[in-house]
Amino acid sequence: MSSVETRNSFNPFRVLFDLGSYGWLHPSRLLLLEIPFVFAIISKVPYTEIDWIAYMEQVNSFLLGERDYKSLVGCTGPLVYPGGHVFLYTLLYYLTDGGTNIVRAQYIFAFVYWITTAIVGYLFKIVRAPFYIYVLLILSKRLHSIFILRLFNDGFNSLFSSLFILSSCKKKWVRASILLSVACSVKMSSLLYVPAYLVLLLQILGPKKTWMHIFVIIIVQILFSIPFLAYFWSYWTQAFDFGRAFDYKWTVNWRFIPRSIFESTSFSTSILFLHVALLVAFTCKHWNKLSRATPFAMVNSMLTLKPLPKLQLATPNFIFTALATSNLIGILCARSLHYQFYAWFAWYSPYLCYQASFPAPIVIGLWMLQEYAWNVFPSTKLSSLIAVCVPLITILKLYTSDYRKP
């Protein structure tokens, strides 16, 4: 066999584990295999009703003229999501015959899942992640369930979040800020990206433009709140309730601690402190590499409008890793996680394990443990311990390692 033939021959190991060596097994082709699989899920696996009816009842009240968030009530209670959620599910209300055509809704969510998976695959290609990372992504049982069998708004939130990350990696900053705010208008979980995003904006664009982007994010939120301005306080306290109590019954991540600790103020204060400490630590060691500025210097730059020094350019790999890490830190320190929240971070966790310089077998093993933990229902002490330990191990390794460079 000639040397040319050897170079051009298909090597499955190289395709799976080499940087950017996707060959003919490109993510777009792999996505085609998802189509019959998704059809099979919809036709063979029973749909599980959790929040869809409540969403439709709340939308129906909105369409009948109710604008007080505390009075937009469904079978599971009052509406607790921002205006973007209302507009989105109003559209779904019309597309699904008032919410009665569940199968049509499932196909819509399947399409959202497919598009989100394609976007993440494109992101992986941009940062030259090995192909096995993408294979792990589409094998996730829980992600398929969240989108296709549960119809949670977390699916649309992850779609807009993925578009936000993609726009950031392409340095389309205005588009990124708008998409981040749109994602937050569906579910405020996307606020977890904000710390790293602001650090990136400040170092890349300077303080004046960073303030401009903050105003863009706020303006988008105000636009979504316009229909509810007559009940201003009701809207903002319901849609962005940071003091919301969580039921120990549904926690995925803290089952291994006693209920008394879970419900205590000291516990919530402790994990909030840990959250802030980790954000500061990553800012000091990793996210500030573009300027080598301290957090105090960054705050001073924002207040005085004096730009930070620019020591190096931001690569897509650096931007992607910083944003995904900021999000994962929030997941680790979350007051409580429910099963649908898996869509907030599962797309990027294998890539972060890879970025933490774990070898492929460890990356795959951590992903398998994570999938196990998030597919145990109800959660157990073991599954919740795993659900906390996997992001903890990933974050600690990310902190102590230098990011891979494609």
From Swiss-Prot:
Record field: catalytic activity: an alpha-D-Man-(1->2)-alpha-D-Man-(1->2)-alpha-D-Man-(1->3)-[alpha-D-Man-(1->6)]-beta-D-Man-(1->4)-beta-D-GlcNAc-(1->4)-alpha-D-GlcNAc-diphospho-di-trans,poly-cis-dolichol + a di-trans,poly-cis-dolichyl beta-D-mannosyl phosphate = an alpha-D-Man-(1->2)-alpha-D-Man-(1->2)-alpha-D-Man-(1->3)-[alpha-D-Man-(1->3)-alpha-D-Man-(1->6)]-beta-D-Man-(1->4)-beta-D-GlcNAc-(1->4)-alpha-D-GlcNAc-diphospho-di-trans,poly-cis-dolichol + a di-trans,poly-cis-dolichyl phosphate + H(+)
GO biological process: dolichol-linked oligosaccharide biosynthetic process; protein glycosylation; protein N-linked glycosylation via asparagine
Membrane topology: Multi-pass membrane protein
Record-annotated membrane-spanning stretches: 72-92, 107-127, 129-149, 186-206, 214-234, 261-281, 313-333, 349-369, 376-396
Ribosomal protein among keywords: no
Keyword field: Endoplasmic reticulum, Glycosyltransferase, Membrane, Transferase, Transmembrane, Transmembrane helix
InterPro entries: Glycosyltransferase_ALG3 (IPR007873)
Subcellular location: Endoplasmic reticulum membrane
EC number: 2.4.1.258
Matches recorded under Pfam families: ALG3
Gene Ontology cellular-component annotations: endoplasmic reticulum; lumenal side of endoplasmic reticulum membrane
Molecular function, one GO term: dol-P-Man:Man(5)GlcNAc(2)-PP-Dol alpha-1,3-mannosyltransferase activity
Pathway annotation: Protein modification; protein glycosylation
Domain of life (superkingdom): Eukaryota
Cited function: Dol-P-Man:Man(5)GlcNAc(2)-PP-Dol alpha-1,3-mannosyltransferase that operates in the biosynthetic pathway of dolichol-linked oligosaccharides, the glycan precursors employed in protein asparagine (N)-glycosylation. The assembly of dolichol-linked oligosaccharides begins on the cytosolic side of the endoplasmic reticulum membrane and finishes in its lumen. The sequential addition of sugars to dolichol pyrophosphate produces dolichol-linked oligosaccharides containing fourteen sugars, including two GlcNAcs, nine mannoses and three glucoses.
Family listed: Belongs to the glycosyltransferase ALG3 family.
UniProt-recorded name of the protein: Dol-P-Man:Man(5)GlcNAc(2)-PP-Dol alpha-1,3-mannosyltransferase
Organism expressing this protein natively: Schizosaccharomyces pombe (strain 972 / ATCC 24843) (Fission yeast)
Phylogenetic placement of the source organism: Eukaryota, Fungi, Dikarya, Ascomycota, Taphrinomycotina
Gene, per the UniProt record: alg3
